[in-house]
Each structure stands twice: as structure tokens, then as C-alpha cells.
Amino acid sequence: MTHRHDSIRMNNHHISATALGRMLRGVLCAVALGLPCSLYAQQATYYASATGEKGAALKTALSRIVRDHTVRTYANLWDDFRETDCRPDGKVWDMYSCITDFTFGDDQAGNFRAEGDKYNREHSFPKSWWGGSSGEAAYTDLFHLYPTDGYVNGMRGNLPFGEVKSVTKQSAQGFSKVGPCSVSGYSGTVFEPADEYKGDFARTYFYMATAYESSFAAWAESEGGIMLAGNAWPGFKAWALDMLLQWAEDDPVSEKERDRNEAVYGIQHNRNPYIDYPGLEQYVWGECQDVAFDAADYKDPATIVGISVPVAAPSDADVPVYDLQGRRIARRHLHGIRIENGKKVAH
């Protein structure tokens, strides 16, 4: 099984940018003009009360829909992970390490000395950002809790997500990294996840900003103030928001995320709208803030704002290409993971 996004490399297969542009515009125009689509019909009732809202008001409307959920105990999470984070081969799906093959139950918690020893419960949105109180619903919210390698989890600590300009620590094969931030607007130490999970974590953070909208201002007074703006909207500081939006665009919603969304819904009885509606973050924070959301007739932002194809791309360029859902499927090469003989292999 491969968890990576399809890519089209233009090397040695020359297609003129002009011809490619015409082809893609034709496809996207057909989509925008009303090809039959039932992709969002099943979620329409759940999100119906947010229909017609835009920007900040849309985020608040979504918050009212998703914030109430069945709160789990911390002990429940071990069993919950079996439903939410199980690889096709039955092993734990670890998003921090590419070398682990953890068995549910047998390898949970306990002492660890190195990467690959044990997995634990990771608050991808650090619990110290709200004071660590177990009384907060976020403490056990599965939409931001993941089973991860204990050693790499400790390497991250409560560092914010970011992109590193130089590596001070890293997991095996450089899958996850720690170092000074290269993103304009922040230069402190950050934790950079692997490319193929950046979109997953971006949508996790969009969910947190939405479900816990009323708490975000207070959370910014703690260590969370590195990424959080101290308000309900936009909720994130400019550097963090720009980065997360880019991550979501570069790493679109995957089958893994959709399956996990359904599994969490079966347990907590709420959903992540940014998975249900790919590109929804553009309606809240991005280029589609002036477009009214329609839960039953959702328009992917790519079909609204169009596409950009370089006029004279060099022969070795990665040209932006979108699929029929408006998801970018070619931009840069990403790390890949596959299951081979029962082992998770990075390539």
C-alpha cells in the first residue's frame, strides 16, 4: 500500500504549457458548469446550518456544528486508535516515523530508548497550549490525537509545526525534523513533519481552530502564542496560517484521512469539515472568503479561482496539475511510504 500523492513529472515527456493549460481549463470549466456530482450530498444535512455563510461567519457556523461531541476518556484512546489509525497490514499508522511496525496493545506506552520501541498518544496540537487540563474536551479529541513513536514524540515535545532551514534533530531517514524555522515571520525552533502528512496536520489545525473557536484567544496566552493569534478569527498568526494553507494545498485530502474521519465520526459523532469538503479552508481564510458556502452544492476552490500554468515552463519543471476534484496532484516530489512484506518502507 502506498501513501503518497500521484505526481506527473514533465521531464523527458514534453507537453507544451499552452496545450496543457487549454486542456485543464476545459476540464475544470466542465466541472464548474455542472457535471453531475453527489460527492457532498451525504454531508449536506450535517452541515446544512452553515449554508450561505462566508469567511469568519462560516467558521463560527461550523464551530456550532462540530464542537459538541462524545468525549472520550484518555484510556479509551488506546482502543480507539485500533479503529482510527490502523494500517492496511493491521499495524499502527505512525505519522512521525517511517520505520515503525507497532502492534496494537503489545507496543503501546511503556519505556522506550530509541525510535521504534513504543508508541504513545500524541496531542498534535500540544496540550500545554491550553494548560494541559484533562478537563478540556480537546484533551481526548481524536481529531488531533494520533498514535506516534514515543521517541520521536519526545523529540518534538510541544514545539510548533513549521519548516526547518537546518536540521538539529531528525527521525530515521530524515522523516521528521527539528530545527530553526525557515518560514518568514518566525525563526524559533519548530518540528517539521514529513511532506505527505503536512496536509493532514494542517486540516487537523483548521479543525481545532474551528471546534475550539471560543477558546483560541485564551490559548494564545500560553506557549500556543507562537502560532495562535489570540482571537477567534483568523485564530492563527499570519506566518502559521500562510504555511498551513500551503500545506493543505500541496498535500490534498487522502483516502487515509477520509477513512479516519469516518472512524472518528463513529466514535465521537462529529466530523472534520476540512476533510469532508477539500479546500474549505479557502472559504474561511483564503481566496474564497467572499463565496457563500453551500453544503449540498459545494464548489471546490480550484474550480472558482481557476488554475495557473507557466507560460514557458523549463523542460525539467514540475507543472501544477489538478484532478477533477480540483486537487493539485503535481507540484513537487514527496517522500513515499509503502508496505512491503509487512514492513513500512520509505522511498
Label for each model-derived stretch:
Residues 337-347:
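C-terminal tail/sorting-segment detector
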Residues 25-38:
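Bacterial N-terminal signal peptides
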Residues 4, 8-28:
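Bacterial N-terminal signal peptides that target proteins for export
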Residues 93-114, 118, 149:
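Short cysteine-rich loop/turn motifs with clustered Cys
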Residues 111-303:
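Domain-level detector of nuclease and nuclease-like folds
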Residues 295-328:
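Residue-level detector of functionally pivotal "anchor" positions at catalytic/ligand-binding pockets or at interdomain
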Residues 41-101, 290:
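N-terminal module-boundary/linker segments of secreted carbohydrate-active enzymes
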